[in-house]
Amino acid sequence: MSESSSTLCELLIQLSEPISEYLSKAQCTQPEGTNVSLKALLEPLLPHKQSPPSPNFNDTQLHSSIRDFTFACALLSSSQSSVHDLLSWIPKHLSAAADLAFLKLSKAYSMAYSKRNNEKLSELGLNYGSVPEEKRLLIELMPEVLPLLKNRIKESSIDKSEDCDEVSAASARVPVGFAIAAAYQFRWFVTQIDYPHLGKLSALVIPCALTALDHWSPEIKGQGMLSFIHIAKNVYAAELGWYQDVILDACCQNIASGDEIWHLVVEMSVLIVTCTQQSNPRSAWFDRMLNEMLSHLERQPRNKERRVAWLRHIEPLFNGVGLVLLAHFRRIFPLFFQWMHADDDETVLLVLKQIETIIKLTWIRNTQYVERLVDELAALYKEAALKRSLEEIRNLVIRILILLHQCKGLQFETVWGKHRDDPNLASIVPSLGETKTTRVAQ
């Protein structure tokens, strides 16, 4: 073994020691109904000092030790964002120690193996000098580790050929806990790499992310969704290549997901479809995705978590389709009219902001909903007196009414006529009067 390799080996053991110590003291809680111990999974991944040192330890074994140590750091670090029983026992100081250790190892590796590292990154189409020093080891490992993680996730997936209870059969083959751990490791690997480098790794990353989305476990699906959210924010559409339609189909298939990951599937789907279809507002994918979401919302209109998540993330899709939104008014506005009078202020504020967006995009032309919308806004303005967000709600209502006045003119004035003398709406009249003056001046 060369001197640089020997030095790196010593550093690896040195970095591993405090993590091993913290891990041994941590109280690992094994989730009920599973025989997977994460501590037992982690301990063999951490190298230990041999006494005496093995004379046969070579560069290949060192590389394997680095890979395993990275797996351990990935799992420990990714636990910081998890509330799952399998990972929630990991203390924050242990995760932080793993973060710091991997950073130190990455920098040392980049110096000791700069030539090898340069070659490996070049094979992936990356410019060595443009990749941050602390990311080079991670990227070099990805062609090796991502297929391993993909296979681990797939081990407990549903076998479509089985006639028995599919989930039970899949779990009987391999405990799902191993796949959950692999999904968290995978998401950690993906989210460490940003634009412009992630696009070069699409062919490595996307198959594993799709495998996670295809799993029956919501926890694993969720990690796949978080990975695709990061991908959509850090790659160009062209870099997704022929995977585009496959990913979009997977998004649509997952819109039926449960409440615990609904917010993730909405954010992922909106980001992916707007990233890939932004130049085609009449794309069938926009239409399919919006209709799938609306179908689920129509079945559960009172589900606060679902409507809030959808209202919070949907605007980029609205912007992407523009005037084509007119074709969806018959499904969107009945939901909006119901949500405008929801008990929670968050829903009310979000739906008002989306109504404002839709009016700006479509000028609400050729629609039967103008009169109903004005009536609902007038009612909401009065209801707001009993809400905590009184001022914010009323300001949004006034802004929307002004927009309606500007785009519908005489039609709006005719509809507003029945509300003009309502003393509870008197404070709105001056704002609408200013709009009328502006229209005349124009």
Whereabouts are the PLM-identified features?
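N-terminal alpha-helical scaffolding segments that mark the starts
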Residues: 1-57
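Short coil/turn segments at helix-helix junctions and helix-capping linkers
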Residues: 3-6, 25-33, 85-93, 133, ...
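Core helices of alpha-solenoid repeat scaffolds
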Residues: 4-20, 58-70, 134-149, 161-164, ...
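HEAT-repeat alpha-solenoid elements in large eukaryotic scaffold proteins
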Residues: 32-53, 99-102, 107-126, 172-190, ...
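Flexible loop/turn segments at the boundaries of HEAT repeats in alpha-solenoid HEAT proteins
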Residues: 50-59, 63, 109-117, 134, ...
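Extended alpha-helical scaffold segments
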Residues: 59-193, 204, 216
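Helix-rich alpha-solenoid scaffolding regions
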Residues: 61-99, 105, 213, 217-279
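Extended helix-rich, non-globular scaffold segments
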Residues: 149, 154-158, 178, 251, ...
